Amino acid sequence: ARDGYIAKPHNCVYECFDAFSSYCNGVCTKNGAKSGYCQILGIYGNGCWCIALPDNVPIRIPGKCHR
């Protein structure tokens, strides 16, 4: 497991707009992470950051997000 921005297909983050919302924690825990929160103004903008996300779940990597 590792920490990171959980990625949708095509290397895009799960966008979020409220640091205090439970949205990201839900997305992360549903995918097997211990927890998660909304990282505001991070390297990829506002995106969900997961703690202890399983290795088989994709994370955002450098390169383009292909919407």
Curated annotation (Swiss-Prot):
Expressed by the venom gland. Residues 67 form a propeptide. GO terms for biological process: defense response. One of its GO terms (cellular component) is extracellular region. InterPro entries: LCN-type_CS_alpha_beta_dom (IPR044062), Scorpion_toxin-like (IPR003614), Scorpion_toxin-like_sf (IPR036574), Scorpion_toxinL (IPR018218), Scorpion_toxinL/defensin (IPR002061). Disulfide bonds join 12-65, 16-38, 24-48, 28-50. Residues 2-66 form the LCN-type CS-alpha/beta domain. Pfam families: Toxin_3. GO terms for molecular function: sodium channel inhibitor activity; toxin activity. It is found in: Secreted. Keywords: Disulfide bond, Ion channel impairing toxin, Neurotoxin, Secreted, Toxin, Voltage-gated sodium channel impairing toxin. Has the structural arrangement of an alpha-helix connected to antiparallel beta-sheets by disulfide bonds (CS-alpha/beta). Alpha toxins bind voltage-independently at site-3 of sodium channels (Nav) and inhibit the inactivation of the activated channels, thereby blocking neuronal transmission. Belongs to the long (4 C-C) scorpion toxin superfamily. Sodium channel inhibitor family. Alpha subfamily. This is Sodium channel neurotoxin MeuNaTxalpha-10.
